[in-house]
C-alpha cells in the first residue's frame, strides 16, 4: 500500500475524518504497518498502552477476562476500525485483549507520535475531545 492509501484509510476513522490531508500524511508516514497471524494477540488486557492500531485488513476479536478468569468476546473489529485508543487517549492500562481471527494487517500509531501531532495541530485535539465525548 502507498502513502495515499494509508491516508484514505485514516480518513475513514471518525477521529481523523476532519483532519486535513497534510496532517494525515504525516500520521501515515510515522505509522508502522504490522501483520498478525490468526490467534496472535495485538495486546493483552492490563498491558501498558503504547499505541493504537487501525485495521487495514482482516478480522480480530476484542476479549475481556471475566471475574471467573474466562475469556469473553465483547466485540469484533474489521477493516477501518481502530483498537487500543482508550489506553493512549486516557492513559490507562489496556481494557481488553485484541486477538487476530484471520491474517490481520494494521497501522500501528504510537502514543508519542499521536500526542506530538495533537500538540502541533490543535484541530486534532478538538477531534479527540469530540471522540471522547461520544
What are these regions (language model features)?
Residues 74, 87, 97-99, 105-111:
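Short hydrophobic beta-strand segments that form the core of ligand-binding sensory/regulatory domains
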Residues 67-83:
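Short acidic-glycine-tyrosine-enriched beta hairpin
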Residues 8, 52, 74-75, 106:
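A residue-level structural signature of the nucleotidyltransferase/glycosyltransferase Rossmann-like core
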Residues 32, 82, 91-97, 103-106:
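Helix-loop-beta junctions that constitute the ligand-sensing/allosteric loops
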Residues 62-63, 85-86, 96-100, 116-117:
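Short beta-strand His + acidic residue motifs that chelate non-heme Fe in jelly-roll/DSBH
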Residues 11-63, 68:
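Regulatory nucleotide-sensing modules
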